[in-house]
Amino acid sequence: DEDNDGTIDRVSIWADNLPACFGICPARGGIIAVCSPDIIYLADRDNDGKAEIRTKLFSGFKVGIIERRMNSPQWGPDNWIYIDGGQGGTITGPFLKNPIKIPTTAFRIKPDGSAIEPVSGHTSTYGFTFNKDGDRFVISTGTPGIQVAPLPWRYLTRNPDIAVRSSRRNAADYNTTFPSSKPHPWRTKRATDPGFGKYYRDRYGSAESIPNGFFTSACSPLIYTDNALPGLSDQILACAPAQNFVHRAEIKREGVLLNIKRLNNKTKTEFLTSEDIWFHPIDLSIGPEGAIYIADFYREIIED
């Protein structure tokens, strides 16, 4: 927007002809893009505004249900890049000595493509977040946050005789929501349809069969690790695009567990809500000045 009128005046295409890309991460003077079935490194070395370097670092990830594809690459506290989703597979790459089998869990990579390995826990939609201590939180459609077990995958798998039921646990004991928008008419119609309503109740419970009031599309959690916004430090935010709000909660350590609780004075409100049913926050990030940036997928319907 060169004249500040709120309308795009010029568009530059830096890279194209990629598979559907569900996240990018800066690395090695370029970016790493996750676009199933590949993880691709892109860079512009001659400064002409186009990425002439394109290297497939890893290949072999499944291309299936959209919300299960690998997504949200970000640097971890250990200088690996963490990526969630992907549904596993036998992964190959030009810088790997041998193919690596990745189960249906999250994983981490070296940015030069020399290593890839599973990590504990996985998200059920999009996104995950770290706190200052390196604890990782993932998310599902029906809860604002899930704590990943503190034991790394590489330790759990050293003993093949140990049976681990799950490497993650629900950190929140609630799933109710308080949007300010009215549900879209299609959601109300779906809830009153006897066939569809029964299908959703039988398969997912009542939370998925009523127009709103419960998490159904929680995604993109973010623990605010800056101090520029008073009162938000170390709290967790999460998007709920289907109900047009951003959720906020605090993280409490209770013994060896980390639990998510609504703030005492915010028990029946959300951090950010809109009455505009086209407002669909889908991603959160912290800017260099400490502000929270929100990606709004502004369209009429989110089908969840």
Show which residues each predicted segment covers.
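Beta-propeller domains with acidic blade repeats across secreted/periplasmic ectodomains
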Residues: 1-304
